[in-house]
Structures are given as C-alpha cells and as structure tokens.
UniProtKB/Swiss-Prot annotation:
Similarity field: Belongs to the SMIM8 family.
Protein name listed in UniProt: Small integral membrane protein 8
Ranges of biased composition (kind: Low complexity): 1-14
Keyword Transit peptide: no
Entry GO terms, CC: membrane
Membrane topology summary: Single-pass membrane protein
Keywords (A to Z) from UniProt: Membrane, Transmembrane, Transmembrane helix
Length: 97
C-alpha cells in the first residue's frame, strides 16, 4: 500500500488535463448548407481583403457623392440666349424675385 504523501505529491506535479474547445463555430457540427450560407462564421479573417473591401466601398460612396454634387450644381445653371443670339450660362433665379 502506498503512503498518502506519495499520492498527494503525484497529484500536485501533474496538472489536470482540460480539453479546450476551438473558439467560434469551427468546432460545432453543422450542415454543409449552413456553412455555405454563413461562411464568415467559419473562415479566418483576412486583413488584406478587409482593407481592400473598405477602400473599395469608400471610393464607391465618394464617387456617388461626387456625382450627386456635380449634378446638383448643374441644376442651378441653365443656358440662356440673349437678344443677339449669344448663348451663355446663367444661374437660375426665382420667378418671384
């Protein structure tokens, strides 16, 4: 029979084994359809692709804002013809002024 002191020394020297789970949904059993519909839950993030996407979306929004601003400026101008037949651009003014 072994002494209690030898059993306690063995228990202290070896750490308890713990099973660690993988973070997120990578360790969960799911269907192929769920993985195909929600790939962002299972794929490791790719920083260069994220940066490219953010820059692309920002440029698209800036371009749309630019088009909106230039179109708005064009609406305030119109082409007028004077009595001599010369064409010139003029800012629109209210009929009531």
């Amino acid at each position: 029979m072994s002494s209690p002191s030898s059993e306690s020394s063995n228990a202290k020297s070896s750490p308890p084994k713990e099973e660690y789970r993988t973070p997120g949904l990578r360790g969960v059993k799911t269907t192929t359809l769920f993985r195909a519909v929600n790939p962002e839950l299972f794929i490791k993030p790719n920083k260069p692709v994220m940066v490219f996407g953010i820059v692309t979306i920002t440029m698209c929004v800036a371009y749309i804002a630019y088009l909106h601003a230039t179109e708005e400026n064009k609406r305030e101008l119109y082409e007028a013809v004077d009595s001599e037949g010369n064409r010139y651009t003029r800012r629109k003014s209210s009929k009531w002024d």
